[in-house]
């Protein structure tokens, strides 16, 4: 039995836009050159944990949702908030909150989950490419 997966069954994966290094930087100097950052760890998923006292604000806004087909994104982080100190940033895609998948969720449901939770464990990834595409499509 052939265990290979047909090409059309592979998921579509969107990667951040890649910019080639400037031609004037010699290839052997590109790794550590200050004008070229090839560090991609900023795009890896990470977990943000927040505790919210009753009546307190989260310190960030979201936009998007199922209607945009691109997910929920952080659209604003209030400076010096707990969310800011935890490393949340504009352009982060919210993958899950408290083990609830946020990749195909209605905006209103996402807001409800975030507002009612006292402890929030968010799985996010920095995804500026889809964030900008999502901003162009929605008004949230």
Swiss-Prot record:
Disulfide bonds: none annotated. GO terms for molecular function: protein-macromolecule adaptor activity. GO terms for cellular component: adherens junction; basolateral plasma membrane; cell-cell junction; cytosol; extracellular region; pore complex; presynapse. InterPro entries: MAM_complex_regulator (IPR051109), PDZ (IPR001478), PDZ_sf (IPR036034). Keywords: Cell junction, Cell membrane, Cytoplasm, Membrane, Secreted. CDD domains: PDZ_PDZD11-like. Pfam families: PDZ (PF00595). GO terms for biological process: neurotransmitter secretion; pore complex assembly; regulation of synaptic assembly at neuromuscular junction; synaptic vesicle transport. PROSITE patterns: PDZ. Residues 47-129 form the PDZ domain. Gene3D superfamilies: 2.30.42.10. It comes from the Eukaryota. Widely expressed (at protein level). Interacts with ATP2B1, ATP2B2, ATP2B3, ATP2B4 and ATP7A. Interacts with PLEKHA7 (via WW domains) at zonula adherens; this interaction is essential for the interaction between PLEKHA7 and the ADAM10-binding protein TSPAN33. Interacts with SLC5A6. Mediates docking of ADAM10 to zonula adherens by interacting with PLEKHA7 which is required for PLEKHA7 to interact with the ADAM10-binding protein TSPAN33. PANTHER family: PROTEIN LIN-7 HOMOLOG (PTHR14063). This is PDZ domain-containing protein 11. It comes from Homo sapiens (Human).
